[in-house]
Regions:
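A secondary-structure boundary/capping signal
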Residues: 22-23, 52-53, 122, 141
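PIN/NYN-family metal-dependent endoribonuclease catalytic core
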Residues: 21, 35-65
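Active-site neighborhoods of divalent-metal-dependent phosphate/nucleic-acid chemistry enzymes
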Residues: 85-119, 124, 128
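Hydrophobic/aromatic ligand-binding patch that stacks against planar heteroaromatic rings
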Residues: 42, 110, 131
């Protein structure tokens, strides 16, 4: 699927946010008992658009399977793949902005190619992006994104 402009209209109850969700943030949002379950629930409801790449999907599957179960991983991946509010990109160019953990660059590259508004992460390796002028990539902490989702729901 090709990246879409932020002006795309989804449903009237969407934030029209295009985000990249770091694996550990996704993992924290999957359990119904989690404080951050709303992040997963709002994705399923189509309230924001998730930007992914094949390498991100592979990491999601591996980490969810190892921390939860292979079945949970399969359900999460199938849910993502069937959702209409997903942008799947193939980043042909790698920016190599994160040197402390080069594996994290797949999230940055996806965000740039998909024109995502920000990456939701708790990983301190992404802090380098705050001082990188090009390409501009914003980061938000999971609690900030959660609060944004809650604020959006308020009448």
């Amino acid at each position: 699927m090709e990246p879409r402009a932020h002006a795309d209209t989804l449903s009237s109850n969407t934030m029209n946010r295009y985000i990249v969700l770091d694996t550990n943030c996704l993992l924290q949002s999957l359990s119904r008992r989690s404080t951050y379950y709303k992040v997963w629930e709002d994705f399923v409801l189509g309230k924001y658009t998730l930007c992914i790449s094949n390498s991100i999907l592979e990491e999601y599957e591996e980490i969810i399977a190892s921390h939860m179960s292979p079945l949970a991983a399969n359900i999460a991946i199938e849910t993502i793949l069937r959702a209409n509010n997903v942008i799947r990109v193939d980043a042909h160019y790698q920016f190599h902005l994160i040197t402390a953990d080069p594996d994290d660059n797949k999230f940055v590259d996806c965000a740039v190619v998909a024109n995502a508004e920000y990456i939701v992460t708790e990983d301190s390796h992404f802090n380098i992006l705050k001082t990188t002028p090009f390409p501009p990539v914003e980061i938000k902490r999971l609690h900030e994104f959660y609060e944004e989702l809650c604020t959006f729901d308020e009448p």
